[in-house]
From Swiss-Prot:
The modification Phosphothreonine is found at residues 516, 521. Keywords: ATP-binding, Cell membrane, Glycoprotein, Kinase, Membrane, Nucleotide-binding, Phosphoprotein, Receptor, Serine/threonine-protein kinase, Signal, Transferase, Transmembrane, Transmembrane helix. Its EC number is 2.7.11.1. This is LEAF RUST 10 DISEASE-RESISTANCE LOCUS RECEPTOR-LIKE PROTEIN KINASE-like 1.3. ATP binds at residues 364-372, 386. Pfam families: GUB_WAK_bind, PK_Tyr_Ser-Thr, WAK_assoc. It comes from Arabidopsis thaliana (Mouse-ear cress). Residues 358-633 form the Protein kinase domain. PROSITE patterns: PROTEIN_KINASE_ATP (PS00107), PROTEIN_KINASE_DOM (PS50011), PROTEIN_KINASE_ST (PS00108). The modification Phosphoserine is found at residue 515. The modification Phosphotyrosine is found at residues 432, 529. GO terms for biological process: protein autophosphorylation. InterPro entries: Kinase-like_dom_sf, Prot_kinase_dom, Protein_kinase_ATP_BS, Ser-Thr/Tyr_kinase_cat_dom, Ser/Thr_kinase_AS, WAK_assoc_C, WAK_GUB.
Amino acid sequence: MFSPVLFRFSKPNSFLVLLFFLSYIHFLPCAQSQREPCDTLFRCGDLTAGFPFWGVARPQPCGHPSLGLHCQKQTNSTSLIISSLMYRVLEVNTTTSTLKLVRQDFSGPFCSASFSGATLTPELFELLPDYKTLSAYYLCNPSLHYPAKFICPNKGVGSIHQDDLYHNHCGGIFNITVPIGYAPEEGALNVTNLESVLKKGFEVKLSIDERPCQECKTNGGICAYHVATPVCCKTNSSSEVNCTPMMPSGSSAHAGLSKKGKIGIGFASGFLGATLIGGCLLCIFIRRRKKLATQYTNKGLSTTTPYSSNYTMSNTPTSTTISGSNHSLVPSISNLGNGSVYSGIQVFSYEELEEATENFSKELGDGGFGTVYYGTLKDGRAVAVKRLFERSLKRVEQFKNEIDILKSLKHPNLVILYGCTTRHSRELLLVYEYISNGTLAEHLHGNQAQSRPICWPARLQIAIETASALSYLHASGIIHRDVKTTNILLDSNYQVKVADFGLSRLFPMDQTHISTAPQGTPGYVDPEYYQCYRLNEKSDVYSFGVVLSELISSKEAVDITRHRHDINLANMAISKIQNDAVHELADLSLGFARDPSVKKMMSSVAELAFRCLQQERDVRPSMDEIVEVLRVIQKDGISDSKDVVVEIDVNGGDDVGLLKHGVPPPLSPETDKTTASSSNTTASSF
């Protein structure tokens, strides 16, 4: 079986290695029968797997957190999630420590795949040399020539290539893994052949040393995991289980000790004994403090906590024990540290995140409520850690609010919340998946706008994915309340991840609005919400209209260097669109003047932005309607780009004919100028 050691060591003095591991030894009483589930193999159809995997009859502590296997009983197929993508496990070879995998979305037609990134976790998997990685581009400029060209509905023109050559001409890119001998065609891609190749899958080798677990089992132990640390659990004569971290291969405490090494061990043992005595005294002190705190609480002096009371706290100030029981080694191993779970998310200690972020040294950015840092967890996951500015009652409420909202939401375009700290932590920290490509704002008018500009097809796809996420939130009774381009993150494939739910509100389904003091970012705040203190989902629609205007123009929402009437982009957009001057708003580098299909799509999106930015919220479209309209615009644009014909517009007109493409433009300049001019369309300059 596979046996992991995730931490690789050089060859230090043996007594230092022993000291390191002695300091992590824990005595964990548990029944003999609790070992049995980790003796059980994962079985699904013809596939079996043991340590370091878990799943079905093997509880999570029996394997690495990232190696959970799922059995589809209807098809007897096994699946594994890697970097948020679902893979089918075709084979597990325990002799060579290899797996054969195929992406779940490649089981059907290629054009129906998710077109999202496929990055293997390097700490766990190594691609075998018989395979290679190719780049698949999509939403490409249709007027250029590409090798291995393909066209997919809603994804436009695409190409398969081994090098990163077309990122400036295409809206999206993702990786595919193929045999080393596969070569895509020079002309049109043979999609049927590619589908056949992808369905056969590829092989990876686990980047794990199996020898420590073999040694553990030879000595009568059971291999398990605490978070991402492999442990060996043994039963003593009193039927109690001791779990200790497994030592790396080649660093045995008994191999080749010199006289100085033995003296060092004696010194280390004495030091460890003194440390244990000090620890006992510290525990007594902490118990006394907790007892006093309980007395204060009983007198009505309790403090606000960031969580509801459906779980209980353990005796240690940085770990959480969830009420209820788990079978197998779960209760025992969870006591080793802070791997507990609150409402489906992991609870971290402050020290664990301090280590993951290298003492909060890698700042990614900051917002109105906290600074965000880059970090790497022990299991290899890259994370973004939000550190709230202060621990006031308001910050605690925002902390709790973001957890309550994100813990129950699952959507491909919403950022994933991995976990948080406890109320006992020195600081309130939230842990999210790390999104590598920055914010949409950086790509539109920030430091990446010149080096890697986003082409129009990709911008339209970003608008669709953002609208889809907001539509999902509204259907779930949630108003984001801070929709802006700095809260729209992009991964390496330019897939959207909407973030920052500190201001979001749960919206009662039986009410038309809720009354609350206006909050948000200048330039994005709904003027009716600002004036009347009445919040509903149409407030997000207004903010999204500003985002659409940024996608069209590449301009910031507020810019005091512009003419005073155009400082607020919402005002500028309304004025330009109403006066039939979209060309003065549009970023001409996107092809508005030279590509008829791009001009048509950008003009249609401008019409939609115009509707979203109306002063009267009742005439704004819903997010559901916005998603539908954007998809129609994209579909029509792709249809037009399949047969590009360059025409010279001798009249210089900008008429696009929106109605025949299903985009109802109320108050639009062409369909009803009289109505538009009589309406109050002046957006707030807030």
